[in-house]
UniProtKB/Swiss-Prot annotation:
BP-aspect Gene Ontology terms: glutamyl-tRNA aminoacylation; tRNA modification
Co-factor binding details: Binds 1 zinc ion per subunit.
Name of this chain's protein: Glutamyl-Q tRNA(Asp) synthetase
Pfam families (alphabetical): tRNA-synt_1c
EC identifiers of the protein: 6.1.1.-
Length: 319
Protein backbone atom coordinates (compact mmCIF):
# COMPACT_ATOMS: atom_id res chain seq x y z
CA UNK A 1 0.00 0.00 0.00
CA UNK A 2 1.33 3.44 -0.90
CA UNK A 3 2.38 5.59 2.07
CA UNK A 4 -0.03 8.44 2.80
CA UNK A 5 1.60 11.87 2.95
CA UNK A 6 1.85 13.06 6.54
CA UNK A 7 0.37 16.47 5.76
CA UNK A 8 -1.29 15.81 2.41
CA UNK A 9 -4.00 18.40 3.03
CA UNK A 10 -1.40 21.08 2.35
CA UNK A 11 -0.58 20.05 -1.20
CA UNK A 12 -0.97 22.99 -3.58
CA UNK A 13 -1.83 23.04 -7.27
CA UNK A 14 0.89 25.28 -8.72
CA UNK A 15 -0.84 25.41 -12.11
CA UNK A 16 -3.39 27.85 -10.68
CA UNK A 17 -1.51 31.01 -9.78
CA UNK A 18 -4.69 32.54 -8.36
CA UNK A 19 -3.73 30.44 -5.35
CA UNK A 20 -0.54 32.44 -4.82
CA UNK A 21 0.33 32.88 -1.15
CA UNK A 22 3.58 34.52 -0.13
CA UNK A 23 4.93 35.41 3.28
CA UNK A 24 7.35 37.60 5.19
CA UNK A 25 8.85 35.92 8.24
CA UNK A 26 11.10 38.20 10.33
CA UNK A 27 12.70 37.11 13.59
CA UNK A 28 11.91 39.51 16.48
CA UNK A 29 15.52 39.96 17.53
CA UNK A 30 15.37 43.66 16.68
CA UNK A 31 13.71 46.16 14.34
CA UNK A 32 13.75 45.92 10.56
CA UNK A 33 16.78 47.41 8.81
CA UNK A 34 17.60 48.23 5.19
CA UNK A 35 18.54 44.64 4.40
CA UNK A 36 15.36 43.13 5.78
CA UNK A 37 13.29 45.73 3.94
CA UNK A 38 14.69 44.51 0.61
CA UNK A 39 13.36 41.01 1.36
CA UNK A 40 10.05 42.36 2.69
CA UNK A 41 9.49 44.58 -0.33
CA UNK A 42 10.37 41.84 -2.82
CA UNK A 43 8.01 39.34 -1.22
CA UNK A 44 5.20 41.91 -0.95
CA UNK A 45 5.60 42.95 -4.59
CA UNK A 46 5.65 39.36 -5.79
CA UNK A 47 2.42 38.61 -3.94
CA UNK A 48 0.66 41.73 -5.22
CA UNK A 49 1.94 41.26 -8.77
CA UNK A 50 0.39 37.79 -8.74
CA UNK A 51 -2.86 39.07 -7.18
CA UNK A 52 -2.11 36.84 -4.22
CA UNK A 53 -1.97 37.01 -0.45
CA UNK A 54 0.96 38.17 1.67
CA UNK A 55 1.15 36.55 5.09
CA UNK A 56 3.12 37.73 8.10
CA UNK A 57 4.84 35.22 10.34
CA UNK A 58 6.87 36.11 13.43
CA UNK A 59 9.70 33.58 13.65
CA UNK A 60 10.19 33.59 17.41
CA UNK A 61 10.90 29.87 17.72
CA UNK A 62 14.36 30.69 19.13
CA UNK A 63 13.00 32.30 22.28
CA UNK A 64 16.39 33.18 23.87
CA UNK A 65 17.09 35.50 20.91
CA UNK A 66 13.69 37.19 21.03
CA UNK A 67 13.81 40.84 22.09
CA UNK A 68 10.73 41.91 24.06
CA UNK A 69 8.67 44.39 22.05
CA UNK A 70 10.57 43.80 18.79
CA UNK A 71 7.63 42.10 17.07
CA UNK A 72 5.41 45.10 17.74
CA UNK A 73 8.08 47.42 16.35
CA UNK A 74 8.34 45.32 13.18
CA UNK A 75 4.57 45.47 12.67
CA UNK A 76 4.58 49.24 13.16
CA UNK A 77 7.41 49.57 10.63
CA UNK A 78 5.53 47.53 8.03
CA UNK A 79 2.41 49.65 8.53
CA UNK A 80 4.43 52.86 8.21
CA UNK A 81 5.89 51.55 4.94
CA UNK A 82 2.39 50.67 3.66
CA UNK A 83 3.35 47.00 3.43
CA UNK A 84 0.07 45.64 4.76
CA UNK A 85 -0.29 41.92 5.33
CA UNK A 86 -3.30 39.67 4.83
CA UNK A 87 -5.04 37.69 7.54
CA UNK A 88 -3.88 36.75 11.00
CA UNK A 89 -0.25 36.77 12.10
CA UNK A 90 1.38 33.40 12.76
CA UNK A 91 3.65 33.16 15.82
CA UNK A 92 6.13 30.29 15.89
CA UNK A 93 6.27 30.37 19.69
CA UNK A 94 2.64 29.20 19.72
CA UNK A 95 3.15 26.37 17.23
CA UNK A 96 4.77 23.68 19.36
CA UNK A 97 1.93 21.19 18.86
CA UNK A 98 2.21 21.41 15.07
CA UNK A 99 5.97 20.87 15.18
CA UNK A 100 5.55 17.94 17.56
CA UNK A 101 3.04 16.32 15.21
CA UNK A 102 5.46 16.50 12.29
CA UNK A 103 8.35 15.31 14.46
CA UNK A 104 6.33 12.35 15.76
CA UNK A 105 5.32 11.38 12.23
CA UNK A 106 8.97 11.24 11.18
CA UNK A 107 9.96 9.39 14.35
CA UNK A 108 7.26 6.78 13.76
CA UNK A 109 8.97 5.91 10.48
CA UNK A 110 12.40 5.64 12.09
CA UNK A 111 13.66 8.87 10.55
CA UNK A 112 14.67 10.58 13.82
CA UNK A 113 17.55 9.71 16.14
CA UNK A 114 19.25 11.25 19.15
CA UNK A 115 22.71 12.77 18.77
CA UNK A 116 25.18 13.31 21.59
CA UNK A 117 27.84 15.22 19.62
CA UNK A 118 28.98 18.71 20.54
CA UNK A 119 29.65 21.41 17.95
CA UNK A 120 33.38 21.06 18.64
CA UNK A 121 33.30 17.33 18.04
CA UNK A 122 31.51 17.80 14.73
CA UNK A 123 34.01 20.48 13.67
CA UNK A 124 36.92 18.20 14.63
CA UNK A 125 35.47 15.12 12.95
CA UNK A 126 37.09 13.15 10.16
CA UNK A 127 35.07 15.18 7.67
CA UNK A 128 36.59 18.48 8.76
CA UNK A 129 38.18 18.92 5.35
CA UNK A 130 34.80 18.68 3.64
CA UNK A 131 33.19 21.96 2.64
CA UNK A 132 29.88 22.50 4.38
CA UNK A 133 27.02 24.98 4.05
CA UNK A 134 26.94 28.43 5.65
CA UNK A 135 30.32 27.94 7.31
CA UNK A 136 29.37 24.76 9.19
CA UNK A 137 30.94 21.34 8.76
CA UNK A 138 28.65 18.52 7.61
CA UNK A 139 27.50 16.16 10.34
CA UNK A 140 29.48 12.91 9.90
CA UNK A 141 26.75 10.57 11.17
CA UNK A 142 28.51 9.65 14.40
CA UNK A 143 25.30 8.77 16.26
CA UNK A 144 23.27 7.51 13.30
CA UNK A 145 23.42 3.90 14.47
CA UNK A 146 23.02 4.72 18.15
CA UNK A 147 24.45 6.94 20.88
CA UNK A 148 27.97 6.11 22.08
CA UNK A 149 28.13 4.56 25.54
CA UNK A 150 27.59 7.08 28.31
CA UNK A 151 26.25 9.78 26.00
CA UNK A 152 22.88 11.49 26.19
CA UNK A 153 21.09 13.12 23.29
CA UNK A 154 21.90 16.79 22.82
CA UNK A 155 19.79 17.07 19.68
CA UNK A 156 17.45 15.00 17.53
CA UNK A 157 18.37 14.64 13.88
CA UNK A 158 16.53 13.56 10.75
CA UNK A 159 18.00 10.87 8.52
CA UNK A 160 18.75 12.57 5.20
CA UNK A 161 18.36 10.30 2.18
CA UNK A 162 21.16 10.22 -0.41
CA UNK A 163 20.87 12.13 -3.65
CA UNK A 164 21.19 15.60 -5.15
CA UNK A 165 18.36 18.05 -4.60
CA UNK A 166 17.73 20.25 -7.64
CA UNK A 167 15.43 23.24 -8.01
CA UNK A 168 15.08 26.44 -9.99
CA UNK A 169 15.40 29.70 -8.11
CA UNK A 170 13.30 32.41 -9.76
CA UNK A 171 16.10 34.97 -9.30
CA UNK A 172 19.29 32.91 -9.38
CA UNK A 173 18.34 30.13 -11.79
CA UNK A 174 19.05 26.38 -11.47
CA UNK A 175 20.45 25.22 -8.12
CA UNK A 176 21.54 21.91 -6.67
CA UNK A 177 22.84 20.55 -3.39
CA UNK A 178 23.71 17.10 -2.13
CA UNK A 179 22.25 17.58 1.34
CA UNK A 180 23.58 14.30 2.72
CA UNK A 181 27.14 15.25 1.72
CA UNK A 182 27.08 19.02 2.29
CA UNK A 183 25.01 19.10 5.49
CA UNK A 184 24.43 15.57 6.70
CA UNK A 185 21.62 14.60 9.04
CA UNK A 186 20.44 17.93 10.44
CA UNK A 187 18.87 18.75 13.79
CA UNK A 188 15.12 19.18 14.18
CA UNK A 189 15.10 19.66 17.95
CA UNK A 190 17.68 20.80 20.46
CA UNK A 191 18.42 19.34 23.87
CA UNK A 192 16.79 22.38 25.52
CA UNK A 193 13.53 21.45 23.80
CA UNK A 194 13.55 24.27 21.26
CA UNK A 195 12.51 23.37 17.73
CA UNK A 196 14.97 23.91 14.91
CA UNK A 197 14.36 26.61 12.32
CA UNK A 198 14.27 24.12 9.43
CA UNK A 199 11.39 22.09 10.86
CA UNK A 200 9.41 25.16 11.93
CA UNK A 201 9.68 26.81 8.52
CA UNK A 202 8.59 23.72 6.58
CA UNK A 203 5.58 23.07 8.81
CA UNK A 204 4.58 26.75 8.93
CA UNK A 205 4.78 27.20 5.16
CA UNK A 206 2.54 24.18 4.75
CA UNK A 207 0.01 25.33 7.33
CA UNK A 208 -0.14 28.81 5.80
CA UNK A 209 -0.56 27.34 2.32
CA UNK A 210 2.53 29.18 1.08
CA UNK A 211 3.11 28.68 -2.65
CA UNK A 212 6.04 31.08 -3.10
CA UNK A 213 8.92 31.97 -0.79
CA UNK A 214 10.75 35.22 -1.58
CA UNK A 215 13.60 35.96 0.83
CA UNK A 216 17.24 37.03 1.09
CA UNK A 217 20.05 35.12 -0.60
CA UNK A 218 21.57 34.31 2.79
CA UNK A 219 18.88 31.63 3.16
CA UNK A 220 19.61 29.93 -0.16
CA UNK A 221 21.66 27.27 1.63
CA UNK A 222 18.61 26.23 3.66
CA UNK A 223 16.37 25.60 0.66
CA UNK A 224 17.56 22.10 -0.24
CA UNK A 225 17.23 20.97 3.40
CA UNK A 226 13.71 22.33 3.57
CA UNK A 227 12.75 20.61 0.33
CA UNK A 228 14.12 17.28 1.55
CA UNK A 229 12.32 17.61 4.88
CA UNK A 230 9.10 18.64 3.18
CA UNK A 231 9.25 15.61 0.92
CA UNK A 232 9.71 13.31 3.92
CA UNK A 233 6.54 14.89 5.34
CA UNK A 234 4.67 14.46 2.07
CA UNK A 235 4.55 18.17 1.22
CA UNK A 236 4.79 19.88 -2.15
CA UNK A 237 7.65 22.44 -2.09
CA UNK A 238 6.93 26.13 -2.65
CA UNK A 239 8.64 27.98 -5.47
CA UNK A 240 11.59 30.05 -4.25
CA UNK A 241 13.26 33.33 -5.09
CA UNK A 242 16.36 34.54 -3.26
CA UNK A 243 16.97 38.24 -3.71
CA UNK A 244 20.26 40.15 -3.32
CA UNK A 245 21.66 41.08 0.07
CA UNK A 246 22.54 44.63 1.07
CA UNK A 247 26.17 44.98 2.11
CA UNK A 248 27.68 47.57 4.43
CA UNK A 249 30.23 49.38 2.21
CA UNK A 250 32.44 50.10 5.22
CA UNK A 251 32.83 46.49 6.34
CA UNK A 252 31.79 44.39 3.36
CA UNK A 253 29.45 42.46 5.64
CA UNK A 254 25.77 41.98 4.92
CA UNK A 255 23.45 44.30 6.81
CA UNK A 256 22.02 42.33 9.72
CA UNK A 257 20.92 42.78 13.29
CA UNK A 258 23.97 40.77 14.43
CA UNK A 259 26.25 43.21 12.60
CA UNK A 260 24.58 46.24 14.17
CA UNK A 261 22.55 47.46 11.18
CA UNK A 262 20.56 50.57 12.15
CA UNK A 263 16.77 50.45 12.28
CA UNK A 264 14.80 51.83 9.35
CA UNK A 265 13.83 55.49 9.48
CA UNK A 266 10.13 54.97 8.92
CA UNK A 267 9.43 58.69 9.19
CA UNK A 268 10.52 58.74 5.53
CA UNK A 269 8.72 55.70 4.09
CA UNK A 270 9.03 56.71 0.44
CA UNK A 271 12.79 57.17 0.71
CA UNK A 272 13.16 53.81 2.46
CA UNK A 273 11.09 52.06 -0.22
CA UNK A 274 13.06 53.69 -3.04
CA UNK A 275 16.33 52.57 -1.47
CA UNK A 276 15.10 48.99 -1.14
CA UNK A 277 13.88 49.09 -4.75
CA UNK A 278 17.34 50.22 -5.82
CA UNK A 279 18.85 47.36 -3.80
CA UNK A 280 16.82 44.99 -5.98
CA UNK A 281 18.48 46.45 -9.08
CA UNK A 282 15.64 48.64 -10.34
CA UNK A 283 15.84 52.27 -11.44
CA UNK A 284 14.14 54.91 -9.24
CA UNK A 285 10.42 55.43 -9.77
CA UNK A 286 8.72 58.78 -10.18
CA UNK A 287 6.24 58.57 -7.32
CA UNK A 288 5.08 61.20 -4.85
CA UNK A 289 3.63 58.86 -2.21
CA UNK A 290 4.35 55.38 -0.86
CA UNK A 291 1.06 54.15 -2.31
CA UNK A 292 1.91 55.44 -5.78
CA UNK A 293 5.39 53.96 -5.52
CA UNK A 294 4.09 50.52 -4.56
CA UNK A 295 1.53 50.54 -7.36
CA UNK A 296 4.19 51.39 -9.96
CA UNK A 297 6.74 48.99 -8.47
CA UNK A 298 4.27 46.08 -8.49
CA UNK A 299 3.51 46.77 -12.15
CA UNK A 300 7.21 46.67 -13.06
CA UNK A 301 7.71 43.57 -10.97
CA UNK A 302 4.85 41.87 -12.77
CA UNK A 303 6.38 42.66 -16.16
CA UNK A 304 9.79 41.33 -15.14
CA UNK A 305 8.60 38.16 -13.46
CA UNK A 306 6.01 36.94 -15.90
CA UNK A 307 2.67 38.55 -15.13
CA UNK A 308 0.91 39.87 -18.23
CA UNK A 309 -1.48 42.13 -16.36
CA UNK A 310 0.31 44.91 -14.51
CA UNK A 311 -2.77 46.41 -12.86
CA UNK A 312 -2.46 45.68 -9.15
CA UNK A 313 -5.40 45.90 -6.75
CA UNK A 314 -4.94 47.82 -3.53
CA UNK A 315 -4.00 45.55 -0.66
CA UNK A 316 -6.24 45.33 2.41
CA UNK A 317 -4.84 46.95 5.52
CA UNK A 318 -3.99 44.86 8.52
CA UNK A 319 -5.77 45.49 11.79
Amino acid sequence: MARRPVLARHRIDFRNRVNYIGRFAPSPSGPLHAGSLVAALASWLDARAHHGLWRLRIEDVDTPRTVPGAAGVIMDQLRALHLHWDGEIMWQSRRGAAYQQAFDALAARGLIYGCGCTRREIADSALRGTAGVDGERPYPGTCREGLPAGRQARAWRVRVPPGVETFVDRWLGPQQQDVAAAVGDFALRRADGLWAYQLAVVVDDADQGVTDVVRGADLLGSTARQRVLGRLLGLAPPRVMHVPLIVDPATGLKLSKQNGAPALDCSQPLRMLQQAWSGLGFAPLAAATPEAFLQAAAAQWAQRFGMRHAAVPASPKAD
